Amino acid sequence: MSFIDSLATLGQYLPAVTKPKEKPSLGQKLVWSLVAVIIYLIMASTPLYGITSASFFKNLILEQIIFASTTGTLAQLGIGPIITAGLIMQILAGSKLISIDLNDPDDRVKFTEAQKGLAFIFILVESALFGYVLARTSTTINASILFIAGIVIAQLIVATYLILLLDELIQKGWGLGSGVSLFILAGVMKIMFWDMFGIASVSSQNLPIGFFPALFTALASHSDVLNLIVNTSTKNLFQPDLVGLVTTIALIIITIYLTTMTIEIPVTSQKLRGIRRTIPLNFLYVSSIPVIFVAVLGSDIQLFASLASYVSPSASNILNTVSGVFFFPPPNSAIPHSIYAVVLDPLGALEYAVVFIVLSILFGILWVDVAGLDPATQAQQLVEAGIEIPGVRNNPKIIEGILARYIYPLAFFSSIIVGLIAVFATLLGAYGTGIGILLAVTIAIQYYSLLAYERSLEMYPLLKRLIGE
């Protein structure tokens, strides 16, 4: 039995959500999607039993955004195992390391089951790792560490598998889009909402954490509002300010514009001679993948540095030094997370920007090659679909050369652009981080298109017959 067959067999034995017998209406899909989000948000607000704090993972902010996780809660792992399994399977399929034809319905089913099986394995492994670390560092219960770890691990396994089922519920047609996208969007919007409107008072100045409540409180009490324009406080490092708010709005507008830009390649169809159309290549060809990989790499090095402190302090110091270049301001530093940090540490800001953008370019080019987005794969798909480029022989090698003129420059420049968006968001203190903004905008645009599509099908039933639904 092959590797993918073994994973698919495991996936088949796991509890699953069945497909609806009849296609739900748009209203029903919206209700199920809302229910899934509410359950996720409840889990993200429910503390793990046996854990008093989760300060050990407090600095893994970017991972929490990417994986829609919340430290110290039932959503500690979030969608991390699902995304990790999905990326690995996509890389294996795109690089032809596994023999599978995603155009074959049976192989697609096998691929989906294998991905689910791999996600479950990651759930077990990550639950064991995080559960043990949390039990060792974040509890005051008078019991053995192994006993507490067992309780925490059990909670993480059940809760994370429930998140997997919620994702499956939406993907199988009960809801809209995918649960993974929906939970990321909900997580980023939650962070942005609290940065703008949070009323909890956590600062040394006794101001609410949200910008607008803090501004109202400061004006009403005739307090100094300069720190709310640009946060220069070394006591309240994470207080959102006006510069961050303006940056957030500007980056959202820029990201929407860039996300909707396309490069059109004229083509014709062998079946429909004389009819010309175009194939759009997204200007942000690699989407937010490069910055996600950079953020995950930095967070993982930081996590391993923390874990290594129990085994080898010297190794931990080395890893902490390496991970420091992935974050600005550096973790555990007394520098406010605002544009003022650039004034205090300009060399650190420059080092962070250079490292982040260079790695974004490397990951962007690598992703194109391993995920099947390269010119050779795209050319082969065009030939198999009977699509031709006018004035060019229908030869995969020739078409590959033409596509290479577009794809690699797009991959290079889009990697730089998403890297710059992430860097400027960090340096200027944008709400939700640059990666969060990129993910939220991309997902929101996808849902807008999906809602328009579903609405069109309901308004014009004839379209269902034309597209075979």
Swiss-Prot record:
Q: Which GO terms describe its molecular function?
A: protein transmembrane transporter activity; signal sequence binding
Q: What residue ranges lie in the Extracellular compartment? A: 48-59, 132-146, 198-240, 310-347, 430-432
* Gene Ontology CC annotations of this record: plasma membrane
Q: Which residues are listed as membrane-spanning?
A: 21-47, 60-88, 110-131, 147-171, 179-197, 241-262, 288-309, 348-367, 411-429, 433-447
PROSITE patterns tied to this protein: SECY_1, SECY_2
Against InterPro entries, the record matches this protein to: SecY, SecY/SEC61-alpha, SecY_CS, SecY_dom_sf, Translocon_Sec61/SecY_plug_dom
Q: In its UniProt record, which GO terms are filed under biological process? A: SRP-dependent cotranslational protein targeting to membrane, translocation
Leader sequence segment: none
Q: Which residues lie on this side of the membrane: Cytoplasmic?
A: 1-20, 89-109, 172-178, 263-287, 368-410, 448-469
Q: Where in the cell is it found?
A: Cell membrane
User: Where is it mostly found?
Assistant: membrane
Q: Which UniProt keywords apply?
A: Cell membrane, Membrane, Protein transport, Translocation, Transmembrane, Transmembrane helix, Transport
Instruction: Give the record's membrane topology.
Output: Multi-pass membrane protein
What parts of the protein insert into the bilayer without crossing?
60-67, 68-79, 80-88
Q: Which HAMAP family match?
A: SecY
The family this protein is said to belong to: Belongs to the SecY/SEC61-alpha family.
What function does this protein fulfil?
The central subunit of the protein translocation channel SecYEG. Consists of two halves formed by TMs 1-5 and 6-10. These two domains form a lateral gate at the front which open onto the bilayer between TMs 2 and 7, and are clamped together by SecE at the back. The channel is closed by both a pore ring composed of hydrophobic SecY resides and a short helix (helix 2A) on the extracellular side of the membrane which forms a plug. The plug probably moves laterally to allow the channel to open. The ring and the pore may move independently.
What do we know about how this protein assembles, alone or with others? Answer: Component of the Sec protein translocase complex. Heterotrimer consisting of alpha (SecY), beta (SecG) and gamma (SecE) subunits. The heterotrimers can form oligomers, although 1 heterotrimer is thought to be able to translocate proteins. Interacts with the ribosome. May interact with SecDF, and other proteins may be involved.
Protein's UniProt name: Protein translocase subunit SecY
Gene from which the chain derives: secY
